[in-house]
Amino acid sequence: MLYLFLTIICTASLFILFRVYSNLKIDLFQSIVWNYVVCSILGFVIQHDQLTQALYDKHMATVIASSLLGSCFLPCFFLIGISTQHAGLTPTTMANKLSMVIPAGFAIAVGIAPFSWFQMLAFAMGIIAIYLVTKKDSSKRIVQTKSFNQFLPLFVFISAGLLDLTILYINQTFATPESGGLFTLHTFLAAAIWGIIALIILLTLKKVYFQSKAILSGIILGIPNYFSVYYLLKTLNYFNHDGSFVFPMMNLCII
């Protein structure tokens, strides 16, 4: 349960930081790019003793799968940040957390998690509780936003759900406790590489201008972001990949 608690704390802090960065006028994209650089460095520092050639040879499928996953992290994380800033913290958090129905439903459907009426009741109560907690504030906020911004939480719901589903699938199919370090490191490394390439292009075309404070904000963001995934994988391993329990419980507590 400690891993689950740490996952909740780290994940919740990300939404708060997005809101703070908006108020401080910090370029979100640059912060996210530096955040993934920090995540990659953390992954190497924490896991470097375990990163042997033999481990790579044994778990090359995990490396490839996590690298492909990492390429999806950047746009999804950026979308969550944009939605938090323009559609509001509450509706974005609601959409992100309600996305648990995708990985949790998949876990039950394919038999990763055992079906029980008690579990289904808890699952339904979790969804209802999240909806009721956020319904009032989100309604007020969305009325005040532009029409396009109203759809941002919907995009967050879809992308976050598919991302969590992919993490669950890869963790179940390829990753093991032994290869967990490789999974985390190469997921963030791929996101960092694509982010740096995109940032260089944008700076060259003068679509954005370099912000030194974005580096510091990226460092602050990167620490909880790395450990949110690191402890999520440990939580899934601890609960035997039971996504129907882990994701609803985690998301309900974050709300």
Model regions and ranges:
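Structural motif at transmembrane-helix junctions in multi-pass transporters
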Residues: 26-27, 79-95, 175-181, 232-250
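Alpha-helical transmembrane segments of compact multi-pass small-molecule transporters, enriched
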Residues: 38-42, 95-110, 121, 190, ...
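Hydrophobic transmembrane alpha-helices of multi-pass small-molecule transport proteins
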Residues: 105-108, 118-137
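Membrane-interface interhelical linkers
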Residues: 1-67, 77-86, 135-156, 186-238
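Hydrophobic/small/kink-forming positions within alpha-helical transmembrane segments
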Residues: 12, 70, 74-78, 100-105, ...
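Residue-level recognition of membrane-helix boundary sites in multi-pass small-molecule transporters
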Residues: 2, 20, 30, 91, ...
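Alpha-helical transmembrane segments
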Residues: 66-69, 114-128, 178-193
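Hydrophobic alpha-helical transmembrane segments in multi-pass integral membrane proteins
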Residues: 42-53, 104-119, 158-172, 224-241
